[in-house]
Amino acid sequence: MKDYDLDLIQVLWVEDDPMVIEQYPLKAENFGLQLVAFPCWDEAKAALENDFDRWSAIILDAKCKYHRDSEDNAVRFLGRALNDIALICEKRGRVIPWYVLTGGDAEEVSDSINDDRMKWDADWTNSTHKEYYSKNVDNEMLYKRIKVHARKSPRLQIQKMYKDVFDAIEECGIDDMGYNALEDLLIPIHFPDAIE
């Protein structure tokens, strides 16, 4: 049984600033997003691997930590986290869009971000000439963009098309394997191009 709000788009969020963790999720809910914060990449990676189908997007604070006790280093953190995300998504056969949200040094952050994100976020870079979102001015725009990108996800579209069925699965207490199996059956029927 899912232990989170199915009406909100689930966003895995790597952020270690307590003030940001307290404030940002409230605003994100207004956009239909639930930000689930993890203080370091180790913990976020475990959540991504253990509940992959839950997540519709990933937000990375560029100045976050790879390990709970490591020092902030955007180059090391982003390089390793983005590599891990690519490997996990490839293994699972589904791309989860990721975004970098930072209040840090633009040059250091930009140099650390690979071009994978251009598959879903190229129009942002083309219009702003940035590969990241600024905590100071872009967070609401990021939430809007995540919502738009997530709505295009075949998995979320199936959940909306068959909302009554998935609600019944929840009410009956059927475990996540049944829920995921039904999604896996319905996606190729409605979105054959989404299958690789």
Q: What are these model-predicted stretches?
A:
Residues 2-19, 24-28:
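Conserved acidic segment of CheY-like receiver
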Residues 35-36, 132:
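Generic structural signal for residues in well-ordered beta-strands
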Residues 134-137, 148-195:
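Charged alpha-helical initiation segments
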Residues 43, 108, 123-150:
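C-terminal output helix
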Residues 37-57, 65-66:
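Acidic, metal-coordinating helix/loop segments flanking the phosphotransfer/catalytic sites
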Residues 12, 97-99, 122, 133:
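Hydrophobic/aromatic beta-strand patches that form the interior of the parallel beta-sheet core
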Residues 54-98, 103-111:
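Conserved phosphotransfer microenvironments
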Residues 24-28, 110-118:
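Short, aromatic/basic amphipathic alpha-helical patches
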